[in-house]
Amino acid sequence: MALSDEQVKSELSKMQAFIEKEAKEKAKEIKLKADEEYEIEKASIVRSETAAIDSTYEQKLKKASLAQQITKSTIGNKTRLRILSTKDEVLHEIFDEAEAELKKITKDKKQYKPVLVGLIEEGVLALMEPKVSIKVREQDVDVAKEAITEAAKNFEEKAKFKVEISIDDKNFLAKDIAGGIVVVNGSGKIEVDNTLEERLKILSEEALPAIRLELFGPSTTRKFFD
């Protein structure tokens, strides 16, 4: 049975409505899927960018922290070096003053002679030989001769044998040193340096820890004490 024109139009309208409905639903489905994919991609990009920002911030923070530590360490080191330098200057001043005082003593015969006696006696006892010579400053020859007599007597009492002590008048000690003597054995191969500079040097090395402690107190970095 053939369809009338009205029936054909009705069927076409139905088909058109169905197609339009299907198209709208498909379009809606595509849009929803696209929106979903967009949100997923957007979230991924946001996470990626956030991670990148966090990483960059963390790196900058680490660099800033490292720079701060380096600066702090540098300042600390410079401060410690400055303190050490100041302490050394103070110690040098102390020993320079001590040397200056020694030079004053050598200008006073009454004070200097007992010092020479002790230095000569100590040097001769160290060598324990029957014949020695001593080197002195040229300006100390007279007082040294007097000191030799007393030092030889003291040596004999302690060593139980005599010693002959002579002054080396060909090899004087430098005029600008503080004073003291150098004792030389009979063969001329062994010397005992008992100049005031040498004695002050030895004293400074031995007394330095105690002087540091007295002046500056216990070291904050030292873990062990004698």
UniProtKB/Swiss-Prot annotation:
Where does this one sit in the cell? Vacuole membrane
Chief location: membrane
Among Pfam families, the record links this protein to: vATP-synt_E
**Membrane topology summary:** Peripheral membrane protein
- Asked if the keyword Ion transport belongs to this entry, the reply reads yes
Q: Which residues form a coiled coil?
A: none
Q: Which GO terms describe its cellular component?
A: fungal-type vacuole membrane; membrane raft; vacuolar proton-transporting V-type ATPase, V1 domain
The family this protein is said to belong to: Belongs to the V-ATPase E subunit family.
Name by which UniProt lists this protein: V-type proton ATPase subunit E
Organism, by scientific name, is Candida albicans
